[in-house]
Amino acid sequence: MPGKLKVKIVAGRHLPVMDRASDLTDAFVEVKFGNTTFKTDVYLKSLNPQWNSEWFKFEVDDEDLQDEPLQITVLDHDTYSANDAIGKVYIDIDPLLYSEAATVISGWFPIYDTIHGIRGEINVVVKVDLFNDLNRFRQSSCGVKFFCTTSIPKCYRAVIIHGFVEELVVNEDPEYQWIDRIRTPRASNEARQRLISLMSGELQRKIGLKVLEMRGNAVVGYLQCFDLEGESGLVVRAIGTACTLDKLSSPAAFLPACNSPSKEMKEIPFNEDPNPNTHSSGPSTPLKNQTYSFSPSKSYSRQSSSSDTDLSLTPKTGMGSGSAGKEGGPFKALLRQQTQSALEQREFPFFTLTAFPPGFLVHVGGVVSARSVKLLDRIHNPDEPETRDAWWAEIRQEIKSHAKALGCHAVVGYSESTSICEEVCILSASGTAAVLNPRFLQDGTVEGCLEQRLEENLPTRCGFCHIPYDELNMPFPAHLTYCYNCRKQKVPDVLFTTIDLPTDATVIGKGCLIQARLCRLKKKAQAEANATAISNLLPFMEYEVHTQLMNKLKLKGMNALFGLRIQITVGENMLMGLASATGVYLAALPTPGGIQIAGKTPNDGSYEQHISHMQKKINDTIAKNKELYEINPPEISEEIIGSPIPEPRQRSRLLRSQSESSDEVTELDLSHGKKDAFVLEIDDTDAMEDVHSLLTDVPPPSGFYSCNTEIMPGINNWTSEIQMFTSVRVIRLSSLNLTNQALNKNFNDLCENLLKSLYFKLRSMIPCCLCHVNFTVSLPEDELIQVTVTAVAITFDKNQALQTTKTPVEKSLQRASTDNEELLQFPLELCSDSLPSHPFPPAKAMTVEKASPVGDGNFRNRSAPPCANSTVGVVKMTPLSFIPGAKITKYLGIINMFFIRETTSLREEGGVSGFLHAFIAEVFAMVRAHVAALGGNAVVSYIMKQCVFMENPNKNQAQCLINVSGDAVVFVRESDLEVVSSQQPTTNCQSSCTEGEVTT
């Protein structure tokens, strides 16, 4: 399918002064695609040139259209010397290759230089004419849509979810080539940016080909990562979920339905909710969009390390308890048989989605993870990346076997990551083992009778909590009780999962962000000795991280974790672990037991007194947390709950039929179940430190909530005021007498102070919630710790939420809190005195932008195809897959950009803070410009996947690499939809257009 690419250079503005004599510039432009280059005329002596060039035409194959970026270089003409480069613009042509997407790219693009940053803007118009080619041997995948969002896009319907797609490409890193010794830093950076752009395009094309082979037309949950392996080379890899999507053409699908989510669900068969509940986790106003996304399920297990499958806390094969009482064994057997046959033909039945349609997940079995330590070697042949492929195949095979051991045949919420230091690389993968409904995996399933069939066979609202394994064949003891909701099937006492909370899950109270942080020193070593030391440390780190999560979850009085993300980072002399998740109280699970401290030194009065004092503090903290998060579950008589799991010696006396019975209740053993306390033994100073660390987490100030999932459980009435922010903080440690305890304290202080500074800066938005909080920790150099956090602050109407969420069960849970105006409850200590040396303050910037009413008015006609003359106000940016108070009407394509910034005058640019802030602000500006040129007005599912910072203070130098991605979309405010809608306007929708962005 060859095509014709047409480019027109219109004008430039705000160019830098390149001729010191005249304080002006003689600018011209080179337009390059592939091996063909065109040049404009030189526009003499102007900082705002008007080229108005002719149309430059490139006749190329569609394979090149997908692989190659359009390069636009702005230069200053010199008569007697080499032309000076002003900057470059890379434009991805891929969004123009979709039949439903934009037909033209037109707008002002920032001219970017890797040394000086943004240096003016250039107005470019790009068009593509494609010729249809049905050649079955073609190497392009034009028309396959890519989405970063990990749920089904809002204005689409999933026909089939095909499954996992992955690919990786390798090459030599230009930064480590011999020619790099003789070329300028600018030339080296630009060679690197161009190569990464080429590899990214090639990767998308290859994944698109795999999707076409599976007869799909889209990739959802697309995650692309760069592995900078130094001298070993450069690896670009990606994973995603292949789907067949249908565009929802019905205008009714986009109408607002503020307080009636069920109205929208009935318009879309995939989202039929057969069992509405007044206190579901999905908010009403923003999540009118969310009804298009898949409702996830939950699971519980410890992460199983690559060497120890038995760490998984969700047991093995067998049918075990079903998902609903009316579903008997025959249906479950048939369901499992169908699903297994549907998934057997797939090598890896993985899904990168974190949200699913109701009924897609039948059961979940637990968090499964695998890690592997590898030694990097040089990539000899870039065309044959078998080594890296084999590494990841091993990891995926292990994940698959872990899931099978848990009685599950699929893994959802799947993700992969790496951590590289010198020659050592840690490969990590994690997901949630699950049993899936085969109807969504086969063709012809989404027809008219789907709603009726779903109502017949769907599990109840608590079905995802029920165990998918046979309780009589568990490889380890676990506490199971009868479900507190249906009281017919067994549930574990705790659930861990890597996916989002289902919109139909019944939760009590609100959720909160729970983090486990851990540092471990290691000796400096080389090659195999280093890899061995890391391998020996990993299992213990995972165990300690898991223990921290369990303790903090119980301290909060909650019983489930969602969105669990564990990151292990390797440095030259230390390993760091950071786990983030959102804790909630699920109504279907038993009330968590308390935490009991047991000492090992009897007959010591002062010690016993200290232990009792600590025990009292823990009990008080649990009580305060239950009040803070409004956790007050209704009392259920223990006779209803059922019996605990028998000991192994008793199991042989029980018949299998008894495990299927939901009516027989044996005598209750009060030593099990919800009466059981979690015992912490204090036998050394490390154990005491662990207990102290439990009590050092300061709760957020009044009016603030935080979570790492898209939506805060228990909060329903969001307003349309949002602020996205990115914060980077770097500290340098002193190597003198550094111990594990001191390292842990410094790391804890760093993360806590980062959160405190965010609460302080966002205090004017109270009451608000920090959603999608994403922490990333890296060790760029010896004794240097860098923490990057991105999140979005969303305000909510607290009074309205109190009125709308009250139910007969929950009236006792609601408190009429009147402390909204109260600010901080903690002393603000942004620079901890305990740090051995000065921490760098965060790269600060307050770029608060307000969308004018005029700009918002332009959104009214956004349902029409974007044209060259269309104007876009402020381009919104959010890590969420939706925009509160708005409807997404069109997806314009994926934004995937990689930038390098280098400076040789670090101190003059404001130090690390000024340098990082300026670079991040420039990245935002370039992302916004590309989205606006496509005719979009927002970026959703935005993520900063990499932020690699390196500095050399002695030479006053620094370098930073940033990789960002997201989905460019067109959205319409619900207030605008009400004007054009023929239906009755809905109420209780706030449509304030104030939105900003805080970059710290």
Swiss-Prot record:
Bound cofactor: record note: Binds 3 Ca(2+) ions per C2 domain.
Entry-linked Pfam families: C2, YbjQ_2, YbjQ_3
Record key words, sorted: Calcium, Cell membrane, Cell projection, Cytoplasm, Cytoplasmic vesicle, Lipid-binding, Membrane, Metal-binding, Phosphoprotein, Protein transport, Transport
Mutagenesis or variant effect for residue 84 to A: Reduces calcium-binding, phospholipid membrane-binding and insulin-stimulated SLC2A4/GLUT4 translocation
Effect in UniProt of substituting residue 26 to A: Reduces calcium-binding, phospholipid membrane-binding and insulin-stimulated SLC2A4/GLUT4 translocation
KW Transport (keyword) present: yes
Binding residues annotated for Ca(2+) 3, in chain numbering: 78, 81, 84
Compartments in which it is found: Cytoplasmic vesicle membrane; Cytoplasm, Cell cortex; Cell membrane; Cell projection, Ruffle
Gene3D superfamilies recorded: C2 domain (2.60.40.150)
Protein name: C2 domain-containing protein 5
Organism, as annotated: Homo sapiens (Human)
Gene: C2CD5
